[in-house]
């Protein structure tokens, strides 16, 4: 069993970036999650990192399993694992399932980081109206001065430009 530190995870991530070996990193993160006893981040957060690496390695089905494991674990994560589940379902060509997961997130509560992820996912898969709604709701849920709010404002602005909409009061906050 292992106590996992942020420094340990940072080293793993740095090595993977240098080697461009997402498979190896995903396997190491899986092993850390299996042996997890305690740490500076939750087991669920490690599972989400593993899921993201499996996606980068071209193995979306394995990524989907890890996102689901993170959701089942229930530990603290910056972004709701259901956002990753939805994105991966879109990637797998299962858009109807992805939309159901997104609707569930909307109905059960979310944080601004989750709203950003869902907005970006919907925009990537062509649902600009849905993406705009998530980005707008995310902005409105954030207090001023929060970094994620700026990211939501930028995403929202890009979506509005893609939709051909004129600048509005929220767009003006981008200064």
Predicted segment positions?
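Residue at a conserved register position within TPR or TPR-like alpha-solenoid repeats
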Residues: 16-19, 54, 89, 122, ...
């Amino acid at each position: 069993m292992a106590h996992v530190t942020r420094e340990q995870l940072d080293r793993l991530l740095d090595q993977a970036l240098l080697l461009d070996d997402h498979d190896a990193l995903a396997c190491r993160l899986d092993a850390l999650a299996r042996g997890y006893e305690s740490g500076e981040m939750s087991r669920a957060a490690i599972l989400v990192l593993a899921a993201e690496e499996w996606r980068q390695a071209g193995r979306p089905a394995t990524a989907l399993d890890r996102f689901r494991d993170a959701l089942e674990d229930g530990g603290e994560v910056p972004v709701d694992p259901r956002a990753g589940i939805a994105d991966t379902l879109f990637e797998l060509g299962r858009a109807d399932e992805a939309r159901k997961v997104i609707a569930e997130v909307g109905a059960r509560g979310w944080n601004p980081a989750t709203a950003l992820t869902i907005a970006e996912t919907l925009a990537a898969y062509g649902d600009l109206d849905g993406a705009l709604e998530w980005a707008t709701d995310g902005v409105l849920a954030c207090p001023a001065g929060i970094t994620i709010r700026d990211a939501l404002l930028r995403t929202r602005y890009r979506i509005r430009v893609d939709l051909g909409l004129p600048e509005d009061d929220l767009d003006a906050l981008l200064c």
